[in-house]
Swiss-Prot record:
This is Amino-acid acetyltransferase, mitochondrial. N-acetylglutamate synthase involved in arginine biosynthesis. It comes from Candida albicans (strain SC5314 / ATCC MYA-2876). It catalyses: L-glutamate + acetyl-CoA = N-acetyl-L-glutamate + CoA + H(+). PANTHER family: AMINO-ACID ACETYLTRANSFERASE, MITOCHONDRIAL (PTHR23342:SF4), N-ACETYLGLUTAMATE SYNTHASE (PTHR23342). The gene is ARG2.
């Protein structure tokens, strides 16, 4: 009887555990679906991070232990940890193929890393509590964080005093975030002297010193201390060199199947890179391949205090160096840079915390192509950065011949076949090539090509009542890239920057993209008997609109809206469809 009672209690206990586990999994999935705004984003996130979780019902009593173990063996992060750690303790290579002696070989589950460089100034206890919760949430979402401490603000003439300060701050961090020996949700360990410097170049001595804690679910905190082999002494290492050294060690030591660097995060009290266009609040998104040099120049004319300007320049340069290096070595643009403040990182709402939101969606909280002059566009202190894609822009300012489509084809600046293939793919229809090129050939205003024809835009000059108006004729993104974070924003920002005064475009009334267009225009209109919705924007609408046809309408600073709408309607309704 006692044995039966024991089995009964165990069965009830297993049911309760099963319920808790099932509820936790359900809540995780619901929170992911709630925080992602589209099905594509939710699918992309779950595809990338699915092996970081065990969504299998491993408490199914109808399965034998053997079957359960075979199904779960080494197919998710938790089930690989013990194997790797035991190998390391036995002084063997922890990361050789996990099925060396088996016929079936499974791909290793990579660690999804986020490297945090935290500037240790002006962070309140309340903010630390919020930051700790953010780290817990990131771990729940499948991210393995690494923390680097930034003490660049300290004077470099006294190692002893700085070391005492760093030890004190490190102990505070352990108290804020949790000790590895404690039974808490968050465990951290403090590491120092992981690097050796030779001729000014830091190298990581032991990659396992970082990876083993990560596989144990512990966040490693790295102190910026390096052993100088040339001078045989310990010294401090600048945070930018430490970040690049750590990133290169993780990428270079043949660990691409073991880990991926998903995020490079800088936590700095001054926040993201300031933008003149956004009235010194932060750039929302930076495509380094296209914008790096322009933004660097902008920082020196943006009326920023020199000490803050220099910090922003350092942050931008460091991000550019690290992301460029990772991009070159990995061959992809998966790594995202984030610069934000401690206050913002401490926010514990997925949709408002830009780090958590970026893990879920791989984009910024708001779109970078939203007009900064409208009240509905919030101002942020966070910048999202990608190495990004190369951009080619052709207009009268950078082309010394007559700007015609045929000339661009003849000079091999635009690949005709690739452009037509892109348009066909993007719109899902066949372009009526001959008539279309004949119509736009001599009316080209701007042509934008992104990447290897990953996206493109064609702007033409159209005429009405003796005036020429910029018309967005084609805005195309390859189907494989539709939904790719930032690509549409990159192209649309270039379009608006190329024609800031006045721009119009049309879209079919049933086009699901119309909501996206509406958020980026000054206004739109459509006739009841027309299939088109017409959008317009530009600085011309910063002027006063005269709706009552007063005599003032011909004065400078006033736009005759009736005349404008008639022009727009005449142009957009008069252009024949370009697809068969």
């Amino acid at each position: 009887m006692s044995k039966l009672k024991t089995l009964n209690r165990q069965f009830i206990s297993n049911l309760e555990t099963h319920k808790v586990t099932t509820d936790a999994k359900r809540n995780l999935i619901l929170s992911i679906l709630k925080s992602t705004t589209t099905k594509r984003e939710a699918k992309n996130y779950l595809t990338k991070y699915q092996n970081q979780f065990d969504f299998n019902d491993d408490l199914d009593f109808n399965k034998s232990i053997k079957i359960k173990n075979e199904q779960s063996s080494l197919t998710n992060r938790d089930s690989q940890r013990e194997l790797f750690i035991n190998r390391f303790l036995n002084q063997s290579n922890p990361f050789i193929n996990v099925y060396d002696k088996e016929d079936v070989k499974l791909q290793k589950v990579p660690l999804r890393l986020a490297i945090f460089k935290i500037k240790f100034t002006k962070i309140t206890i309340k903010q630390w509590k919020g930051i700790a919760e953010t780290f817990k949430r990131l771990i729940t979402l499948g991210i393995s964080p690494i923390i680097m401490l930034d003490y660049d603000h300290l004077p470099s003439d006294s190692y002893k005093n700085n070391e005492l300060y760093m030890i004190n701050q490190g102990n505070k961090m352990l108290n804020y975030l949790g000790h590895p020996e404690e039974e808490s949700d968050l465990k951290v360990t403090l590491l120092r002297s992981l690097f050796t410097s030779h001729k000014g170049v830091p190298t990581l001595d032991s990659l396992e010193s970082i990876l083993i804690p990560l596989y144990q679910g512990i966040i490693p905190i790295i102190q910026p201390i390096v052993y100088n082999a040339d001078l045989s002494k310990q010294e401090f290492l600048a945070s930018d060199k430490l970040l690049l050294g750590l990133s290169s060690a993780l990428i270079e030591k043949r660990t691409t199947d073991l880990l991926s660097i998903e995020k490079i995060v800088m936590i700095d009290p001054i926040g993201g890179i300031p933008s003149i266009e956004r009235h010194q609040t932060s750039h929302v998104f930076i495509n380094l391949s296209q914008e790096y040099s322009d933004i660097l120049s902008e920082l020196f004319i943006g009326h920023i205090e020199p000490k803050y300007r220099d910090t922003h320049v350092d942050n931008l340069n460091t991000m550019n160096n690290v992301l460029s290096y990772i991009n070159e070595k990995s061959g992809n643009d998966e790594t995202t840079g984030i610069i934000t403040t401690p206050e913002i990182m401490s926010i514990n709402i997925d949709q408002l915390n830009p780090i958590i939101y970026n893990v879920l969606t791989d984009r910024a909280i708001i779109s970078s192509s939203l007009p900064s002059t409208t009240n509905r566009t919030p101002h942020l202190s966070t910048t999202i950065i990608k190495k990004g894609v190369e951009v080619q822009i052709f207009d009268v300012d950078n082309y010394d011949k007559d700007l015609t489509m045929q000339n661009l084809f003849d000079d091999k600046l635009v690949n005709k076949e690739k452009l037509i293939d892109l348009l066909n793919d993007s719109f899902g229809k066949s372009l009526d090539v001959g008539p279309y090129l004949d119509r736009i050939n001599k009316n080209i205003a701007t042509v934008v090509i992104v990447g290897d024809y990953d996206g493109a835009a064609i702007i033409t000059w159209e005429y009405s009542k003796g005036e020429k108006i910029a018309y967005l004729d084609k805005f195309a993104i390859a189907k494989k890239n539709q939904g790719l974070p930032g690509l549409a924003d990159v192209i649309f920002k270039i379009i608006l920057q190329s024609h800031p005064f006045e721009l119009i475009w049309r879209s079919r009334k049933n086009n699901p993209v119309n909501k996206w267009y509406f958020e980026r225009c000054c206004g739109c209109m459509s006739a009841p008997d027309s299939q088109w919705k017409i959008f317009y924007t530009g600085e011309v609408f910063d002027k006063k609109i005269d709706r009552f046809k007063r005599k003032l309408r011909h004065q400078n600073g006033v736009v005759d809206i009736d005349r404008k709408l008639q022009q727009y309607s005449e142009i957009c309704e008069g252009i024949t469809p370009s697809f068969k």
